[in-house]
UniProtKB/Swiss-Prot annotation:
Pfam families: ARD
The record's free-text note on cofactor binding: Binds 1 Fe(2+) cation per monomer. Binds 1 nickel ion per monomer.
Keywords: Amino-acid biosynthesis, Dioxygenase, Iron, Metal-binding, Methionine biosynthesis, Nickel, Oxidoreductase
Organism annotation: Methylococcus capsulatus (strain ATCC 33009 / NCIMB 11132 / Bath)
InterPro entries cross-referenced by the UniProt entry: ARD, ARD_bac, RmlC-like_jellyroll, RmlC_Cupin_sf
Protein name per the record: Acireductone dioxygenase
Pathway given in the UniProt record: Amino-acid biosynthesis; L-methionine biosynthesis via salvage pathway; L-methionine from S-methyl-5-thio-alpha-D-ribose 1-phosphate: step 5/6
Chain sites annotated for binding Fe(2+): H96, H98, E102, H140
GO molecular function: acireductone dioxygenase (Ni2+-requiring) activity; acireductone dioxygenase [iron(II)-requiring] activity; iron ion binding; nickel cation binding
Annotated CDD domains: cupin_ARD
Gene Ontology BP annotations: L-methionine salvage from methylthioadenosine; L-methionine salvage from S-adenosylmethionine
Similarity comment: Belongs to the acireductone dioxygenase (ARD) family.
Site annotation Important to generate the dianion: residues: R104
UniProt EC number: 1.13.11.54, 1.13.11.53
Length: 186
């Protein structure tokens, strides 16, 4: 189940909790973020190649490319046995921005996005079928969990793909990791 919690950036008071998909989409639209529920009915082997996953969703990827001018797409696929899962998690947990507009479509698994526009932090638990945009220059971080299980198509407006500009902030340390978030809010 997708979930949105909205926190003051201090992280010191109880958040607003939103569980219904249309309400999540409406609140995120207020900050320029697209949230949609898509069909993600295809099953993949744990070691499925990026091209296999992109080919399975080629029509959807092409529609998004045409609509938003995306130049590239890739797949982040991380399971509990991934040899670099700890390094990837540590990198994604650091607050950063991107100079381009990006979209994420979860085709398997889940992950926790934190968006930090202004003085609020929006935590979005994304699961299979969720599509989420990250507007350009929006401070954010992502937690895939200690035992990740996700396949996510990422679309970029630049050919370079995922290029992060890390802010140097430790704000991510003040908010719960995926496992604690699930215990408290899910």
């Amino acid at each position: 189940m997708s979930l949105l919690t909205i926190h003051p950036e201090s992280g010191t008071s109880a958040p607003e909790i939103i569980r219904e998909g249309d309400a999540i989409a409406a609140r995120l639209a207020e900050i320029g973020v697209l949230f949609e529920r898509w069909q993600a009915g295809r099953a993949f082997e744990p070691d499925a190649e990026q091209q296999t996953i992109l080919a399975a969703y080629a029509d959807s990827v092409e529609r998004l490319k045409a609509k938003y001018g995306f130049e590239s797409a890739d797949v982040i696929s991380v399971g509990p046995d991934h040899p670099q899962k700890d390094e990837l998690r540590a990198r994604f947990l650091r607050e950063h921005t991107h100079s381009d507009f990006e979209v994420r479509f979860f085709v398997e698994g889940r992950g926790l996005f934190y968006l930090h526009p202004g003085d609020r932090v929006y935590a979005i638990l994304c699961e299979r079928g969720d599509l989420l945009s990250v507007p350009s220059n929006t401070r954010h971080w992502f937690d895939m969990g200690a035992e990740p299980c996700l396949k996510c198509i990422r679309l970029f407006t630049t050919a370079e793909g995922w290029v992060a500009d890390f802010t140097g902030s430790d704000i991510g340390d003040r908010f719960p990791r995926l496992e604690d978030y699930l215990k408290h809010y899910a």
